[in-house]
Amino acid sequence: MSSPHVLVVDDTHVDRHVISMALMRHNVRVTAVESVMQALVFLDSEHDVNMIVSDYCMPEMTGYDLLMEVKKSPRLVHLPVIIASSDNIPERIRKCFDGGAKDYILKPVKIADVPRILNYI
C-alpha cells in the first residue's frame, strides 16, 4: 500500500511546515498550500488525496468554508477533514463538527496528534 496523501491548508508558513513535518514523520505524503482557493484548485486536479488538514482562520475563505465546499462535492464528500486552530472556541468547534469535520485539533499540532488523525483515513 502506498503512503497516504494529506493536503495541508494553512496561510502561515511556519504552521504549514510544522504540520507537514509531523505528518511526514509518520510516512505520510504531504501537499501543502496556503489558501482555500489553492486547495480547491488542487483538489479539482488531484484525485489521490486521502485527508485534508486545514487551518480555521485564513484570509478570504476559512477552513470551515473549505469544509463546506468539500462536503457539497459528490467527488470529495468522503474525504475526512481535520480542522486545526489555535482558538479553543466551543461554538466554532461545534460548528465544524456539525458541518462534517472529523476532528478539531489545537495548534501547534504535535507529533502525538498525528496517529489520532491518521485513524480517519
UniProtKB/Swiss-Prot annotation:
Residues recorded as bearing 4-aspartylphosphate in the entry: D55
SMART domains: REC
Gene name per UniProt: RR13
Alphabetized Gene3D superfamilies for the sequence: 3.40.50.2300
Task performed by this protein: Functions as a response regulator involved in His-to-Asp phosphorelay signal transduction system. Phosphorylation of the Asp residue in the receiver domain activates the ability of the protein to promote the transcription of target genes. Type-A response regulators seem to act as negative regulators of the cytokinin signaling.
Post-translational modification: Two-component system major event consists of a His-to-Asp phosphorelay between a sensor histidine kinase (HK) and a response regulator (RR). In plants, the His-to-Asp phosphorelay involves an additional intermediate named Histidine-containing phosphotransfer protein (HPt). This multistep phosphorelay consists of a His-Asp-His-Asp sequential transfer of a phosphate group between first a His and an Asp of the HK protein, followed by the transfer to a conserved His of the HPt protein and finally the transfer to an Asp in the receiver domain of the RR protein.
InterPro entries associated with the record: ARR-like, CheY-like_superfamily, Sig_transdc_resp-reg_receiver
CDD domains: REC_typeA_ARR
Phenotype upon gene inactivation: Dwarf, narrow leaf and low tillering phenotypes.
Record's keyword terms, sorted: Cytokinin signaling pathway, Phosphoprotein, Transcription, Transcription regulation, Two-component regulatory system
The organism of origin for this protein: Oryza sativa subsp. japonica (Rice)
Family: Belongs to the ARR family. Type-A subfamily.
Positions of the Response regulatory domain: 5-121
BP terms from Gene Ontology: cytokinin-activated signaling pathway; phosphorelay signal transduction system
Tissue expression: Expressed in flowers and panicles.
Protein name: Two-component response regulator ORR13
